[in-house]
Amino acid sequence: MLPIVPVGRLILSAAGQRAPYSSVHVVQQVTKAMGYTTVERGTLNTTSYCLYFKYGDSFISPFHDIPMLADEANRTYNMVVEIPRWTNAKMEMSTKEPLNPIRQDIKEGNLRYVKNCFPYHGYIWNYGAIPQTWEDPGFIDTNTNCKGDNDPIDICEIGYRVAKRGDVIRVKILGIMALVDEGETDWKLLAIDVNDPLAKDLNDVQDIEKHMPGMIEATFEWFRIYKIPDGKPGNRFAFNGEAKNREFAERIIAETHNHWKALMQRTDTSPINSSTTTLEGNPHLMSQQEAESVVTSAPVPGPGAGQDAAIDKWYYVTVK
């Protein structure tokens, strides 16, 4: 099956032709089977680091230009991997800047890392987001009675392979959990890479417990306690922490996709940067020349800085 190309003005050079934007100093890695590449700028483990996305020779926004659906007929979705399994750096699409590169979250001037709450180390799944979705902070969800968290909808990919930051993978949705994080609705999708050996056996949320016993319980516990070492209370959930089924999850995805579509038509002042390079007729359309300028203005790549050994520290926590 051929990869689905983002809709709109996407100019790809013919095979063998030199890419027209070769002036950009890049470190590229090809994401599996989909034609997406990533472009590193700045220095890893510093505030300057950022990861831009391309499709073919064209810069794109992973938030707005990668289609939500990978294959509508087979109900599979695209996932942008922000944080590979077992890692601690809190990476996420930067929703407030042009092209929405992946950056490490910063809190009080410091790079943010999740703590290792025993027995978990870092993130226990490949973690990321579904593109072309948005949890609207102006929308009060009737399931949680809380507003959205102003981000694309989060997703935990539970397969065996440790993905790479910036991978774009096709996933099958299995279920969803409704985390309430500091008073905001923060949906957590459960999914599996369609190429995972278990994918054929996992079709809904009940199949996770059957074939991966303990995964849902561990996911609930991880989200409940992961902020406690930072001095915050345990997180709470709607539905008493129950993971809802695939049908429910896909309704939530559709709802957040509609919120994203409305966002992309807004022309008022918004903290979200809606720049797109592929969606013709959109008020936020950006030319490739403008996109290249954004990337070249970012710091040039440098050798990665080391991480503090304290990142590997265990934390033993209880929920009060």
Regions from the PLM with identified roles:
Residues 2-320:
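Hydrophobic N-terminal alpha-helices or hydrophobic patches in metabolic proteins across all domains
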